[in-house]
Amino acid sequence: MEARDILKRPVITERSSELMAEKKYTFEVDTRANKTQVKDAVEEIFGVKVEKVNVLNYKGKFKRVGRYGGYTNKRRKAIVKLTADSKEIELFEM
């Protein structure tokens, strides 16, 4: 997988906005990507140094439309912590 395939989109919520003060950035990533691949992708795309990566897996929710039921897509989020001497990611600046 290429770096652009691994990182899908940034996750911008109240909690992720608070974590940005600690140089922690949240991304939705490919479900098949591991921590090492996420780290390499962030370093390649944004030109920063990554200290640590935490990964969260979410199961799909059961949804029903009339009598038909199914599941939404499963998701995977990564919280990436940058090193102290690394520059910030401009993508998240508002």
From Swiss-Prot:
Q: Which UniProt keywords apply?
A: Ribonucleoprotein, Ribosomal protein, RNA-binding, rRNA-binding
Q: Output the InterPro entries linked to this UniProt entry.
A: Nucleotide-bd_a/b_plait_sf (IPR012677), Ribosomal_uL23-like (IPR013025), Ribosomal_uL23/eL15/eS24_sf (IPR012678), Ribosomal_uL23_CS (IPR001014)
In Gene Ontology terms, what is one molecular function of this protein? Answer: rRNA binding
Q: What Gene Ontology cellular-component terms does the record carry?
A: ribonucleoprotein complex; ribosome
Show the Gene3D superfamilies listed in the entry. 3.30.70.330
Q: Which GO terms describe its biological process?
A: translation
Superkingdom, according to UniProt?
A: Bacteria
Q: Name one Pfam family in it.
A: Ribosomal_L23
SUPFAM superfamilies tied to this protein? Ribosomal proteins S24e, L23 and L15e
Query: How does this polypeptide assemble, per the annotation?
Result: Part of the 50S ribosomal subunit. Contacts protein L29, and trigger factor when it is bound to the ribosome.
Family, per the entry?
Belongs to the universal ribosomal protein uL23 family.
- Note the NCBIfam families from the entry: PRK05738.2-4
Its annotated function is as follows: One of the early assembly proteins it binds 23S rRNA. One of the proteins that surrounds the polypeptide exit tunnel on the outside of the ribosome. Forms the main docking site for trigger factor binding to the ribosome.
Q: What is this protein called?
A: Large ribosomal subunit protein uL23
Annotated organism of origin = Lysinibacillus sphaericus (strain C3-41)
